[in-house]
Curated annotation (Swiss-Prot):
Pfam family, any one: GrpE
Database matches in InterPro entries: GrpE, GrpE_coiled_coil, GrpE_head
One Gene Ontology CC term in the entry: cytosol
Region (Disordered): 1-28
PROSITE patterns xrefs: GRPE
Gene3D superfamilies reported for this sequence: 3.90.20.20, Head domain of nucleotide exchange factor GrpE
Cited HAMAP family: GrpE (MF_01151)
Gene name tied to this protein: grpE
Signal peptide: none
Cystine connections: none
Identification of the protein by name: Protein GrpE
SUPFAM superfamilies: Coiled-coil domain of nucleotide exchange factor GrpE, Head domain of nucleotide exchange factor GrpE
GO molecular function annotation: adenyl-nucleotide exchange factor activity; protein homodimerization activity; protein-folding chaperone binding; unfolded protein binding
Amino acid sequence: MNHEEQKVETMEQVEAQPVEPTDVDSEVTAEQARIAELEAQLEAAQLASNEERERAIRAVAEMENLRRRAAQDVEKAHKFALEKFAAELLPVLDNLERAIELADKESEELKPMIEGVELTLKSMQSGVAKFGLNPLDPLNQPFDPNAHQAMSMIENGELAPNTVIAVMQKGYELNGRVIRPAMVMVSKAPA
């Protein structure tokens, strides 16, 4: 046999021999299993981390909403703390206006008293205005059920229907919130 034939025969013998698993193959398989296990643990840890991150973001957003609501509640409490007190002052303002309206302005003896009542009324009006208590002036304005209380309706062809044509009692608002609606007469279309 020549050298070439010997090589071919040896190679055929090597190829024909069954390859038995060695310790190297079992080590590779064990390492692959360990890698797969670690990858699964990593994926589970990442999912848990994402869930915790989302939970933390929601908690922060909820805290911000709570803080904002608390600030709004405090602001409203400051703004409307005077509401009951202001409502109690309204009859005093009404009485001062009524006293001026009904006073005999021709009487010389009453002129100093009328001036005093007028000054008291102006002083009181400017004082309550500093705290946000302002009268509503609905005359010739469209009727607003949130700010007006209709006491009667009168036919009027000159004004649009549901227009305030007379104010029987002033309404007041405190910082934009109506604390007493104005009592008004409202126009209606002629029949």
